[in-house]
Structure formats: structure tokens, C-alpha cells
């Protein structure tokens, strides 16, 4: 494991997902789960998210579609927040989720809309 990539990944993960979230995830890591956190920091964030070929905004847009299709509600809520942090508007998120509904099915779209709306309500009310 490259310490440089790990540090770069952790810094980018904090920017995109928010420092509080990442701090909680890292603090909760134990002997069993720490390798998964380190893999995410180094490979996902240090190698892939930091590549020059796509902007963070574009990567967030892609993630919304893929995570919706995979039916990963916790990760979708997290990445709706990340998408907003990376400059996507609620309108762009809505359009992405409409695209999900057409290509992944109405149930996937409905669930994704419900989860995104929960994030928006949390942000609007200061609950998140």
C-alpha cells in the first residue's frame, strides 16, 4: 500500500464525502473492517477518483446511476450529498434519476428519488 496514494485518497474522499463522514467511518474501522477503508481510500479515491480523465462532477453523475442500478441505498444517499458537493444541482440529480428509472426500472427510479429527497430534506432542515 502506497502511503502517498493513501493520503491523497483520504484527502479527496474528505473533500467529496465530507470530513465528518470520513472521520466517523475511519474511527469506526476495526481490525476486521480497516482493510476495506484503506482499500477505498487508496484505490477508489487515490487512484480512480483522482485521475484526470473525468471531472469530479462527471464521476458523481456516473456514480448516481450505477449506485441506483445496484440498489445500494446507504451509498446512494452518501453520493447524492457528494454530487451536490461536486457541483451537481438538484435538477441535474433529478434528470439523472429519471434516466435511471427508464433504464433500470421504475422501482429503482422511485427508490432513488425517495432517497435523494430524504437527503434534500435533511439538508434543508439542518438535520444532515
Q: Whereabouts are the PLM-identified features?
A:
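Acidic, glycine/proline-rich low-complexity segments that act as flexible tails and inter-domain linkers
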Residues: 1-57, 85, 111-128
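Gly/Ser/Thr-rich beta-alpha loop segments that engage phosphate groups in nucleotides
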Residues: 20, 67, 107
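Mid-chain, well-packed structural core segment of small domains
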Residues: 61-64, 68-94
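C-terminal structural segments of small proteins and small subunits
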Residues: 102-112
